Amino acid sequence: MALNLKINRQIRAPRVRVIGSSGEQLGILSIKEALDLAREADLDLVEVASNSEPPVCKIMDYGKYRYDVTKKEKDSKKAQHQVRVKEVKLKPNIDDNDFLTKVKQARAFIEKGNKVKVSCMFRGRELAYPEHGHKVVQRMCQGLEDVGFVESEPKLNGRSLICVIAPGTLKTKKKQEKVHAQDEKQ
């Protein structure tokens, strides 16, 4: 919300519609009367709607109002959890210990709430045998099915086999799909 509102002497309209500090309508008053009312209450006269005729002004503590607005904005930013996509790169002929390390790494990403993009890179003639890459990616998906579900099935994209695993279980995915289907019906 923009905090560049006109307050007190910055308001130039000759007559304004005034709202009291507790929200009651005080009617249309001259700017001098409205400023006197605000001064008596030891508060500010703030123009909240300048495009109406006459402009709407509210008697309030402007400093407290500004503080509340910035606090709400900060809280809403904190509440938003941004899901990042982390990538784990594999090769079709990866050794078991290296594979287990990659599974642990992907598991840590998913447990933190991030999506994991599993990509199996083919080099040279490895592309002639894409089934080896499919086996590795399927093993990775099976190793992570207790903490995440496959959001996009493995598909070949150039020289890479790519799959995305999202946090949650298959049950949560089915619930989300069910709710989404009900929303589309309505």
UniProtKB/Swiss-Prot annotation:
Entry's localization field: Cytoplasm
Single Gene Ontology MF annotation: ribosome binding
Domain of life: Bacteria
Any GO BP annotation: ribosome disassembly
Pfam family, one: IF3_C
Keyword tags: Cytoplasm, Initiation factor, Protein biosynthesis
Any single GO CC term annotated in Swiss-Prot or TrEMBL for this entry: cytosol
Primary role: IF-3 binds to the 30S ribosomal subunit and shifts the equilibrium between 70S ribosomes and their 50S and 30S subunits in favor of the free subunits, thus enhancing the availability of 30S subunits on which protein synthesis initiation begins.
Family recorded in the similarity comment: Belongs to the IF-3 family.
Quaternary structure note: Monomer.
Annotated HAMAP family: IF_3 (MF_00080)
Protein name, UniProt field: Translation initiation factor IF-3
Originating species: Chlamydia muridarum (strain MoPn / Nigg)
